């Protein structure tokens, strides 16, 4: 018997099959092989066709079943992970009324700022833990203000994962975690933030039915089965946005645990047992997958735009003949602190953790008689690592007591200089685990159905690929970090 998981990204869709008995991975597939198109009719806009996501889900499902020579009737349930903060609106026929406004669309920034003040900044922080920002609710208000003929035809609005569940089941359902990422969940009252919707002029009846992240959220109907190739009647047991789901995939579920990502941009996702926040201008707080009224589990999300993109820029523009492994090895030949060379890696747009500062990247203390290319490689890796540590200090100030750090098997966390710098400065070992969001979603669905006692059991077959231990000698790392942070503070003042 198997469980299937989907990860609905903006670049591609992934699907995975896991064995029901122990959570082992049977297969993982991705489609399309080239990135899905994102339509940008104006600067700052980003839209995708939700039906295209569904078409790729159907293609992947049939491919998984055929290539692995299994019976579709052996698939027992479904889990869904999806790109966060997107907006899909459907009419009474349950078809999209317009393209989805996805996560990287920035058209609603001003709307969110205005709502934050009209609804009351203190009330927003106390109840929804965030400013409405540029998230799902603000995007819906944009439609109301700019496309009233479409808004007036809306039957339900939803997140990308909710739409895929709708296509499978014919039911409009969402989750508290999903509503929290759209800044519509009242943590203080453990309910939909009706007061915020009313202030925004949004009819609460447009919200889909609300069910827990781990629960029966619908069953594959006849049409969903016919189009996808799945058996009719199997349950959708789980859904969550990609960052909470990434943490779940790494079995990051309890206060103090951190899931880190070091891709083009960097993410630190920390679990907290507290509902309050002191840092709402620099981090976002959402309901984690296992959050309940009587069990506070808040995912505190800190993003760093200028991470892997900086390292890839150095590779492509300065040393294209070297591989990343060769760059990493060269960096290891340079002492901690890069002989004084410092790089601030903030060259990929406004950085929320720096309160939306957008001054660009900086190289400091470059000495033509001392510094070689290897120094640049190390200073780049250290600068990114220092940014992560700086972000973790913000999380600590927001009540997170770090107990463990886990990361997926991506390029930056395979770089010894990068990972050991973080491990040493936080005094936390970093475990690198090979997994994917689609696998995590499949396991979470099986867990929700009672096939596993907890997510630790569901992920027990995952092997730790690599462990980065703190260096026994902390002083040079701390000195280098303190010097870098002083440079950062001067950079922010000027």
PLM regions and their residue ranges:
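Extracytoplasmic ligand-binding clamshell segments of periplasmic binding protein
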Residues: 206, 212, 243
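Residue-level signal for inorganic ion chemistry
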Residues: 23, 49, 78, 105, ...
């Amino acid at each position: 018997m198997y469980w299937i998981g989907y990860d609905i990204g903006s670049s591609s869709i992934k699907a995975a099959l896991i064995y029901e008995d122990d959570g082992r991975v049977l297969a993982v597939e991705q489609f399309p092989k080239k990135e899905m198109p994102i339509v940008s009719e104006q600067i700052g806009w980003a839209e995708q066709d939700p039906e295209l996501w569904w078409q790729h889900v159907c293609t992947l499902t049939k491919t998984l079943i055929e290539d692995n020579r299994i019976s579709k009737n052996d698939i027992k349930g479904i889990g869904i992970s999806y790109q966060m903060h997107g907006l899909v609106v459907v009419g009474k026929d349950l078809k999209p009324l317009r393209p989805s406004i996805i996560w990287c669309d920035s058209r609603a920034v001003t709307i969110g700022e205005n709502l934050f003040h009209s609804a009351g900044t203190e009330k927003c922080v106390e109840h929804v833990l965030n400013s409405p920002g540029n998230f799902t609710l603000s995007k819906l208000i944009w439609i109301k203000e700019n496309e009233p003929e479409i808004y007036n035809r809306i039957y339900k609005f939803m997140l990308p994962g909710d739409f895929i569940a709708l296509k499978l089941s014919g039911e409009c359902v969402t989750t508290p975690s999903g509503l929290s990422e759209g800044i519509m969940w009242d943590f203080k009252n453990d309910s939909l933030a009706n007061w915020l919707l009313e202030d925004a002029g949004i009819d609460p009846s447009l919200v889909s039915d609300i069910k827990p992240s781990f629960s029966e959220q619908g069953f594959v109907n006849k049409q969903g089965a016919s189009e996808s190739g799945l058996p009719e009647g199997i349950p959708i047991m789980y859904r969550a946005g990609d960052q909470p789901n990434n943490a779940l995939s790494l079995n990051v579920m309890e206060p103090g645990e951190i899931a880190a990502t070091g891709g083009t941009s960097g993410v630190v996702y920390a679990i907290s047992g507290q509902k309050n926040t002191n840092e709402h201008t620099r981090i976002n707080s959402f309901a984690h997958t296992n959050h309940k009224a009587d069990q506070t589990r808040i995912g505190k999300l800190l993003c760093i735009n200028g991470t892997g993109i900086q390292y890839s820029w150095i590779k492509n523009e300065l040393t294209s003949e070297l591989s990343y492994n060769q760059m990493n090895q060269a960096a290891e030949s340079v002492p901690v602190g890069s002989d004084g060379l410092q790089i601030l890696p903030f060259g990929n747009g406004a950085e929320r953790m720096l309160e939306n500062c957008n001054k660009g990247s900086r190289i400091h203390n470059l000495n033509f008689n001392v510094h070689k290319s290897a120094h640049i490689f190390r200073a780049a890796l250290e600068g990114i690592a220092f940014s992560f540590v700086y972000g973790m200090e913000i999380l600590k100030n927001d009540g997170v007591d770090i107990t463990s750090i886990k990361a997926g098997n991506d390029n930056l966390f395979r770089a010894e200089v990068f990972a050991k710098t973080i491990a040493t400065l936080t005094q936390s070992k970093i475990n690198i685990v090979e997994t994917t969001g689609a696998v995590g979603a499949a396991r979470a669905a099986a867990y929700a159905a009672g096939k596993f006692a907890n997510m630790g059991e569901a992920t027990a077959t995952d092997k730790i690929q690599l462990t980065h231990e703190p260096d026994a000698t902390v002083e040079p790392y701390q000195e280098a970090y303190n010097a870098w942070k002083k440079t950062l503070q001067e950079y922010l003042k000027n």
